[in-house]
Amino acid sequence: MAKRVQHEGGDYRPQKRSKNERNGEGSKVSPSAEAIRNELDPISDATYVQSPALGDLSQIEIDQFLAKHCIKVTDSSEAPPLRPIISFSHLPSSFSKIYDPLSSFSSPTPIQSATWPLLFAGRDVIGIAETGSGKTLAFGLPCIKKILDSGKVKRKHARPAAVIISPTRELAMQIYDQLSKFGASVDIRVTCIYGGVKKDEQREALKTAAIVVATPGRLKDLQNDGSVDLGKVKYLVLDEADRMLDKGFEQDIKDIIRSMPDSKRQTVMFTATWPPSVRDLAATFMTSAVTVTIGGDPSADPRANTRIKQVVEVVKPQEKEARLVQLLNRSQRGAAVCDKVLVFCLYKKEAVRVERLLRTKNFKVAGIHGDLNQHERFKSLEAFKTGAATVLVATDVAARGLDIPSVKLVINVTFPLTVEDYVHRIGRTGRAGADGHAITLFTETDKAQSGALINVLRAAKQDVPDALLKFGTTVKKKQHGAYGAFFKDVDTSKSATKIVFDE
């Protein structure tokens, strides 16, 4: 079905999507099934009209904005480029009521500016940006507007119009919290589906939800037992796609997508990195996707947010916990007594021990790790968000996706297993344009990671302590347990299996 884009007074009408253009397996639908799926009116084709104010900007101003925020847009189609939406005043004027919650923000983030016009125009989009860059509203606002444009706000028979898949319960709940604020103003129902809780209430909420935010495992379960029909989904988002593949959800995701309409679906993918496994997934289920990259080359070595001041202290293993207490006493005093500090440990047992230690030192502390049930995790996160707890002790279950505002300091008590996880951890501070601070306690047992860490520090123009340099600057070549140092020659991403490791 054609998509119409109006750009600076001219019309662009790309060709209809063809099922043969897709490389995915199992995407064909029998005529009878297709007829059933078309029982309800589909979400209408997208029409994007650029605002006059945006058109009045000079090309020099547009180029300067793109360069300032390191925005790169790659589009293999012949469609004319769409200008980034630099100001909220440049948003489409129709259904302006949904923009009311934006009043608390000063301007769109770079990923929002670059992807909004493409998504409003109905294009498939791959967004590559650091966590904390405003991705939820980047895909959420076009989702809500698309449903409003269709005139099919009310849903029934557990047939949602849009599905957003995220890797963790915590991230799914965050997305739900943001989108429900926008949906409530226009009577669009949003529901959140995740594991660890009973299914009955979720089944009931699915009956009338227009937008479903879900983790892949629970969504697959509810789909298998007939609680939800994805045959009417016209807008699909895969958020933190790289993280979902890391967690072994590739087959679940493929099965879920194959149950959705093929030719009338707009697909959006957001990811922090761009490994071959994510590229393969995008090529399988997306059509002529536009890639929007914020920052440097996502396939290169991991890079930390340059707004984060990184400090690495080389200490003895037995000194770490005492040094942690000193750092917290120093950081939480005077005007900063209520500042939020996120403390990362490597294993669950370590996190429990550190949490107990800090509680004995009279810090207002909460914890989040794999041994806690959903209610306990939610309680800890809420305590941290509201300020009832100013220190949150976490394992890497919280390293990606959690949107906790105003984290002033991240402390790594134990260095993670990879430098990529290090970058994700410290990315919890310095979000939404703010400055951040991260302190890492590095020991001799972590020396295999010294070279990679030094590269991250140097790339962000941070100081590299002499004690860290003594461990060496060599970056250890990645190895695979079965294929050794030559694992890159073997594509292991084709048959991902869900494996859960003890933290």
Curated annotation (Swiss-Prot):
GO biological processes: endonucleolytic cleavage in ITS1 upstream of 5.8S rRNA from tricistronic rRNA transcript (SSU-rRNA, 5.8S rRNA, LSU-rRNA)
Residue numbers binding ATP: A129, E130, T131, G132, S133, G134, K135, T136
Motif (DEAD box): 239-242
Boundaries of every Helicase C-terminal domain copy: 307-472
Major localization class: nucleus
A matching Pfam family: Helicase_C
Gene Ontology terms for molecular function: ATP binding; ATP hydrolysis activity; RNA binding; RNA helicase activity
Region (Disordered): 1-35
Basic and acidic residues composition-biased segments: 1-25
Motif Q motif: chain residues: 104-112
EC number: 3.6.4.13
Helicase ATP-binding domain residues: 116-292
Annotated localization: Nucleus, Nucleolus
Swiss-Prot/TrEMBL catalytic activity: ATP + H2O = ADP + phosphate + H(+)
Record keywords, A-Z: ATP-binding, Helicase, Hydrolase, Nucleotide-binding, Nucleus, Ribosome biogenesis, RNA-binding, rRNA processing
One GO term describing the cellular component: preribosome, large subunit precursor
Function: ATP-dependent RNA helicase required for 60S ribosomal subunit synthesis. Involved in efficient pre-rRNA processing, predominantly at site A3, which is necessary for the normal formation of 25S and 5.8S rRNAs.
UniProt free text on domains: The Q motif is unique to and characteristic of the DEAD box family of RNA helicases and controls ATP binding and hydrolysis.
Similarity remark: Belongs to the DEAD box helicase family. DDX5/DBP2 subfamily.
PANTHER family (alphabetical): ATP-DEPENDENT RNA HELICASE DBP3
Protein name as catalogued: ATP-dependent RNA helicase dbp3
Species, as recorded: Neosartorya fischeri (strain ATCC 1020 / DSM 3700 / CBS 544.65 / FGSC A1164 / JCM 1740 / NRRL 181 / WB 181) (Aspergillus fischerianus)
Record lineage: Eukaryota, Fungi, Dikarya, Ascomycota, Pezizomycotina
